[in-house]
Amino acid sequence: METFPLLLLSLGLVLAEASESTMKIIKEEFTDEEMQYDMAKSGQEKQTIEILMNPILLVKNTSLSMSKDDMSSTLLTFRSLHYNDPKGNSSGNDKECCNDMTVWRKVSEANGSCKWSNNFIRSSTEVMRRVHRAPSCKFVQNPGISCCESLELENTVCQFTTGKQFPRCQYHSVTSLEKILTVLTGHSLMSWLVCGSKL
């Protein structure tokens, strides 16, 4: 099973134990009509996509002790690189979606070379908002641990196939239904995308 650790705060999925200051930062981040972003032209008409609270991919557990600047940067990074509201993308198939989205969102390595892989979580803002109200995980029996899991979300993984420099990168895609599993233990807030079925 492949998992992607995610920074839960960026999704705005805050469990009851989250501190008041953390809640304040999240409220400040997610106002302004759900963060409407105008995406620049890329040989197509200018589009507007609604981008909500999003996680950033991490490789280790994340503490709640993030500064406001770090959190803002984290939120913006994930919004632009990993979140895709289905209403905002008219592309017909996953391969085109991967190729178009990586150009549109300017997904590349720092040196301008093609990124080996990237994933786009495709979900309506309504589904994302409801995750914190999702049922509790049945396997957690420790009173010090809070856990919940979402409904299934569409996750498209774009795997690099050809090209050298951005924007001439081509990707192969695999889309699967996955659930967001969220866990709060003491001062650590963690979340994972847990693989479900391939589409």
From Swiss-Prot:
Give the positions annotated as glycosylation sites. N61, N89, N111
What does the record give as the active site? H82
Question: Which superkingdom is the protein from?
Answer: Eukaryota
Mind listing the UniProt keywords for this protein, alphabetically?
Disulfide bond, Glycoprotein, Secreted, Signal
Example of a GO MF term: endonuclease activity
Positions annotated to bind substrate: K115, W116, S117, N118, N119
The residue range of the signal peptide is 1-16
Naming one, the record's GO cellular component terms include: extracellular region
| Location within or outside the cell | Secreted
Biological processes annotated in GO: defense response to Gram-positive bacterium
Q: InterPro entries recorded for this chain? A: RNaseA, RNaseA-like_dom_sf, RNaseA_domain
PANTHER family with a match to the protein in the record: RIBONUCLEASE, RIBONUCLEASE 11-RELATED
Q: What is stated as this protein's family in its record?
A: Belongs to the pancreatic ribonuclease family.
Return the protein name.
Putative inactive ribonuclease 11
Species source reads Homo sapiens (Human)
Q: Which gene encodes it?
A: RNASE11
